[in-house]
């Protein structure tokens, strides 16, 4: 055995390749061993270092792969099981154990995370050269008993099923011990590169090969100073020196130092200064400004900015002649940067390769299996069924059929297998084609119902049923169609998923064989196997930026290296033990077992491993290195790593460069990036004045960019402070509103127009509606209460009111419409009870009807031949609506209008003046259409009746009598009343001066109401609808005002100038704010002024 070490700036690969070539020259077959994470990259590096650039006698591989070469043709006793099959076997074993048999893990024995932890521990025990029996040394008796029982049962299942899940290295070791491979080992040599520790299994294999006379060369990075040091704790090279010293002691070999002949570079001098800091010695070298220029420390605000600055720098280097393959990008946290990496690097048109496997979880086939599993487990929940259909690989529904089906399922709130098994019957005014929907339902449900009828049966029987199901679901045809327009790379990914799917089913058949399995367990196992599968990823081309985690980097990896995301939280990475065995358990097992057996204790390796990783990172570049840390990662504040801060301390004294937008050619990455940056600079406030040079630069850049975009026919969308709408064409207006027909309006249409003109366009012209639902809503609640009161008032008034109310409630509850609405679920029953309480409370007001009789309910107006008003061009305008109730005053026959409200509503002169509260005046005008009525006579008022359960806070009252009075105040008719009729009205009518009108004032009110309708009619017929939601205070838009942001793009902070300001009283004309009668007169006078214009 030969042990070698060299300075970190001396390429260890070159040294070891030279050793390998000399071994080949003596007739040896050389296996060049690298760690799993580096084997692919190491193969390329070895080939580059070979004098002949290739050699059949040198194989670059991993320990496990090398062992496979020797056992490939071995006739193994059992069937091979991979991790997926092993997981299934553990699952099967655990289901056969009763919950009571496992004192600690009984309740989580089927949990996928627990099964994964058991698999990890199984492999870890193999790697550590330990057996399941060694778990007997655990201290906690219940935990010990459970783990021993589980693994004993797993071992029994492996033997009984003739399965083999042993590692390749263990099998190879058995062959070495038996002497089967002596002839092959005679010409074998090993060169081992990139390790600072061996697992117990790897160490055992190296020992066996050494004893068989195999030549072994092991190399690592370390300085002579570190190796000779008596005290190594805390040294940067502690991990590699400890590794060397242990091997030297075990094999009685003295490590050889390989001197570095070339002159020391900047990174070598910086490394020596850092090493001196950690071993508390004086640095023997000085760092110059030239040295400092080769290592930069960046500080940025967030990940996005950090990646953008890296992208710009890469583009600049490429412009200067650097190849993408000469650049390496390292992440402190790959997960945190992965999504933004694709967005930004695509924007800057930088090809890259992220060297990590990708989960198949988002593939339609995996989602197909997941949806099936959830449908069975949760009994056909709506979202699970829709997710299955939206995978695009189930059934033969067209997109239009799927949309129609989904709309109905959401409308009728179809959940559960029972509802989906029955024909759909619920409808809303015939809006849905039930025959078509039921045909779709049968096509969707038939395969699922047939498959889910499967009970516990053998694995072969279950797989046969599953095969029938996927054929009925046209899975294969749909997957084939999915591939039609995909790229070659995507087609390969689809093939990988199908292979993984088939392999999972094969492993299931192999593990369970003739065992009985429940359908739920089958689907859970298939899903678990699919989620464990990953895509194989290989770079599409050689000339790409290699992207990886910083802890996988080697010294001298690339000429230019960018390491970003190096915050204190992520650099260094603190390995955490999340296994079933604690660090104390591991230490106890290590002490109790053979010296060749050892479980890794991550916490004990953290410090020396992290220091060595940091040193490797500092030496990863051959020309320039950039280390960067953002202030925010995933919107969470973090600080710069202490390793980076150490570089800023004397004598290194590296400056921290705070990256900001700059105006120079270095800041341009590509046309896409330049476009993005110009828009960004245009939108954001600039925190400093631009110099003349910067202004000139951006002016020229914009001109060049515009020419480029114009040549390609691309326009830049303008973000304007003004939202403009297109007017309707005359042909459209004529089709919507023929001149020979009156323009039909309503009080609600009037209010909608004045709230936001574009809202009227959306609701009344485009006819867009909110999603329908079968569940009772505010409208159905109102109809329910209206129906009760209608029946009460139609009954014989000589009967007791409470009896009439009970009869009306009973009859209304039994009506088909309301019975289906309010008997569907416990929630709807509870809602009905609240409505009945409201009906009884409101009924107390109806009971006090002395001097009043009801002569009409749900009375429709606006159907008479006489129009509501005539426009100046002779166009007729009619106003339609429905009055909840018309009352007659017995004293003189005058009429009044009642409108039921489910919430507190009051008449407001200000809102009426601005067109937002015209309901009551419109109803008063409508009464005049009734036969025998003269304008402005025989009216006593228009009012709201609040249909709610009155609530009074007792803390606001002094005694119980006050609470009763407060309740009485809330249960009153509130609205507009004629002053000369107030004496004839009872106590249930709110009598206030502000809402008491004279006949003359009523006439002004109704005349102004016509003006409002005239403005709306003229605006609609003009065909132009502004985006102008109203603002009450001129500072913001109230949350209850529809802004339709998703359609219009309206943003209050940008477009508030377009909002309609409400007209208000000029308070400067009054000594103090008017109230009561003065307030009424002020608004009536303002209306007169408008009428006189």
From Swiss-Prot:
Keyword Nucleotide-binding belongs to the record: yes
Entry keyword set: ATP-binding, DNA damage, DNA repair, DNA-binding, Exonuclease, Helicase, Hydrolase, Nuclease, Nucleotide-binding
Keyword Chaperone part of the UniProt annotation: no
Gene Ontology BP annotations: double-strand break repair via homologous recombination
Enzyme class: hydrolase
Gene Ontology molecular functions: 5'-3' exonuclease activity; ATP binding; double-stranded DNA binding; helicase activity; hydrolase activity, acting on acid anhydrides
Cofactor dependency: Mg(2+)
The organism's place on the tree of life at top rank: Bacteria
EC number: 3.1.-.-
One Pfam family in the UniProt entry: PDDEXK_1
Subunit and interaction comment: Heterodimer of AddA and RexB.
Function comment: The heterodimer acts as both an ATP-dependent DNA helicase and an ATP-dependent, dual-direction single-stranded exonuclease. Recognizes the chi site generating a DNA molecule suitable for the initiation of homologous recombination. This subunit has 5' -> 3' nuclease activity but not helicase activity.
HAMAP family (UniProt xref): AddB_type2
UniProt cross-references to PANTHER family, sorted A to Z: RECBCD ENZYME SUBUNIT RECC
Entry's family note: Belongs to the helicase family. AddB/RexB type 2 subfamily.
Remaining remarks: Despite having helicase-like domains, this subunit does not have helicase activity.
Name of the protein: ATP-dependent helicase/deoxyribonuclease subunit B
């Amino acid at each position: 055995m030969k042990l070698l070490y060299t300075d970190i700036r001396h390429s260890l690969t070159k040294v070891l390749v030279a050793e390998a070539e000399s071994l080949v020259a003596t007739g040896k077959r050389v296996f060049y061993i690298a760690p799993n994470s580096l084997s692919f990259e190491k193969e390329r590096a070895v080939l580059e270092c070979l004098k002949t650039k290739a050699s059949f006698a040198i194989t670059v591989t991993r320990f496990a792969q090398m062992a496979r070469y020797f056992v490939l043709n071995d006739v193994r006793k059992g069937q091979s099981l991979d991790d997926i099959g092993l997981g299934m076997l553990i699952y099967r074993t655990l289901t056969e154990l009763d919950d009571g048999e496992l004192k600690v893990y009984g309740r989580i024995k089927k949990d996928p995370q627990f099964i994964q932890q058991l698999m990890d521990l199984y492999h870890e025990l193999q790697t550590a050269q330990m057996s399941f029996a060694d778990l007997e040394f655990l201290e906690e008796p219940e935990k010990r008993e459970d783990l021993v029982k589980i693994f004993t049962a797993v071992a029994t299942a492996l033997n009984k099923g003739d399965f083999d899940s042993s590692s390749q290295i263990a099998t190879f070791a058995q062959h070495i011990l038996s002497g089967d491979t002596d002839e092959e080992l005679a010409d074998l040599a090993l060169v081992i590169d990139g390790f600072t520790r061996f697992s117990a299994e790897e160490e055992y294999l190296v020992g066996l090969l050494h004893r068989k006379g195999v030549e072994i060369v092991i190399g690592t990075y370390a300085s002579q100073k570190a190796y000779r040091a008596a005290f190594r704790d805390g040294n940067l090279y502690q991990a590699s020196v400890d590794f060397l010293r242990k091997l030297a002691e075990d094999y009685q070999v003295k490590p050889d130092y390989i001197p570095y002949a070339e002159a020391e570079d900047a990174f070598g001098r910086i490394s020596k200064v850092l090493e001196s800091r950690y071993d508390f010695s004086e640095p023997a070298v000085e760092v110059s400004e030239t040295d400092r220029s080769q290592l930069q420390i960046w500080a940025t605000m967030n990940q996005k900015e950090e990646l953008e600055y890296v992208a710009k720098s890469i583009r600049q280097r490429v412009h200067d002649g650097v190849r993408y393959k000469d650049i390496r990008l390292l992440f402190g946290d790959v997960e945190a940067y992965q999504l933004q990496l694709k967005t930004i690097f695509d924007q800057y048109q930088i090809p890259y390769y992220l060297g990590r496997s990708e989960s198949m979880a988002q593939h339609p086939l995996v989602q197909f299996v997941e949806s099936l599993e959830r449908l069975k487990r949760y009994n056909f929940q709506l979202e699970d069924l829709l997710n299955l259909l939206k995978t695009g690989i189930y059934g033969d529904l067209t997109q239009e059929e799927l949309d129609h089906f989904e709309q109905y399922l959401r409308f009728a709130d179809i959940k559960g297998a029972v509802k989906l098994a029955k024909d759909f019957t619920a409808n809303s005014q015939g809006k849905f084609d039930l025959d078509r929907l039921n045909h779709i339902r049968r096509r969707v449900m038939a395969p699922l119902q047939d498959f889910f009828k499967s009970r516990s049966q053998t694995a072969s029987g279950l797989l046969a049923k599953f095969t029938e199901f996927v054929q009925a679901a046209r899975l294969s045809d749909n997957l084939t169609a999915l591939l039609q327009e995909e790229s070659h790379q995507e087609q390969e990914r689809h093939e990988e998923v199908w292979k993984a799917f088939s392999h999972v089913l094969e492993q299931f058949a192999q593990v369970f064989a003739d065992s009985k399995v429940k359908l739920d367990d089958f689907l859970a196992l298939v899903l678990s196997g699919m989620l464990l599968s990953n895509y194989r990823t290989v770079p599409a081309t050689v000339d790409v930026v290699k992207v990886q985690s910083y802890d996988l980097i080697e010294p001298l990896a690339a000429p230019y290296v960018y390491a970003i995301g190096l915050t204190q939280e992520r650099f260094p990475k603190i390995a955490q033990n999340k296994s079933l065995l604690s660090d104390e358990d591991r230490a106890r097992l290590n002490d109790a077992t053979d010296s060749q057996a050892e479980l890794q204790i991550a916490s004990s390796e953290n410090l020396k491993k992290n220091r060595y990783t940091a040193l490797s990172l500092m030496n990863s570049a051959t020309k320039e290195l950039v280390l960067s840390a953002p202030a925010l990662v995933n919107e969470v504040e973090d600080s710069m790593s202490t390793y980076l801060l150490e570089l800023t301390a004397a004598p290194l004294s590296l400056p921290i460069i705070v990256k900001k937008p700059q105006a120079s050619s270095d800041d341009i990455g590509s046309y896409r990036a330049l476009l993005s940056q110009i828009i960004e600079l245009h939108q954001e406030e600039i925190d400093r004045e631009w110099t003349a040079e910067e202004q000139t630069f951006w002016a020229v850049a914009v001109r060049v960019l515009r020419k480029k975009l114009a040549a390609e026919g691309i326009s830049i969308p303008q973000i304007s402070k003004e939202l403009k709408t297109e007017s309707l064409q005359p042909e459209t207006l004529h089709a919507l509103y023929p001149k020979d027909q009156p323009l039909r309006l309503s009080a609600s249409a009037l209010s909608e127009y004045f709230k936001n003109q574009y809202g009227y366009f959306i609701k009344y012209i485009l006819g867009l509606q909110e999603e329908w639902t079968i569940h009772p809503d505010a409208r159905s609640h109102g109809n329910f209460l209206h129906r009760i009161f209608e029946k009460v008032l139609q009954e014989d008034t000589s009967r007791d009111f409470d009896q009439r109310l009970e009869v009306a409630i009973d009859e209304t509850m039994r009506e088909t419409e309301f019975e289906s609405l309010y008997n569907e679920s416990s929630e709807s029953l509870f809602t009905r009870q609240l409505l009945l309480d409201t009906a009884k409370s409101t009924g107390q007001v109806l009971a006090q009807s002395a001097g009043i009789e009801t002569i009409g309910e749900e009375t429709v107006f606006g159907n008479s031949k006489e129009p509501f008003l005539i426009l100046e061009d002779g166009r007729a305008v009619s106003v339609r609506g429905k009055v909840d109730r018309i009352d007659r005053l017995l004293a003189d026959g005058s009429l009044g209008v009642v409108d039921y409200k489910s919430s507190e509503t009051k008449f407001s002169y200000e809102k009426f003046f601005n067109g937002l509260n015209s309901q009551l005046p419109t109803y008063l005008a409508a009464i005049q259409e009734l036969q025998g009525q003269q304008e402005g006579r025989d009216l006593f008022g228009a009012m709201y009746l609040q249909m709610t359960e009155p609530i009074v806070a007792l803390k606001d009252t002094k005694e119980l009598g006050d609470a009763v009075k407060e309740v009485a105040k809330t249960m009153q008719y509130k609205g507009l009343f004629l002053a000369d009729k107030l004496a004839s009205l009872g106590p249930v009518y709110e009598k206030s001066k502000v809402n008491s009108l004279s006949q003359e004032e009523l006439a002004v009110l109704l005349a102004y109401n016509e003006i409002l309708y005239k403005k709306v009619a003229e605006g609609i017929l003009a065909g132009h609808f502004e985006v102008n939601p109203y603002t009450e205070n001129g500072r913001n838009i109230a949350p209850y005002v529809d802004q339709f942001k998703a359609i219009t793009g309206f943003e209050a902070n940008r477009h508030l100038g377009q909002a309609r300001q409400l007209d208000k009283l000029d308070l400067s004309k009054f000594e103090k704010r008017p109230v009561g009668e003065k307030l009424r007169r002020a608004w009536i006078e303002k209306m007169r002024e408008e009428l006189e214009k």
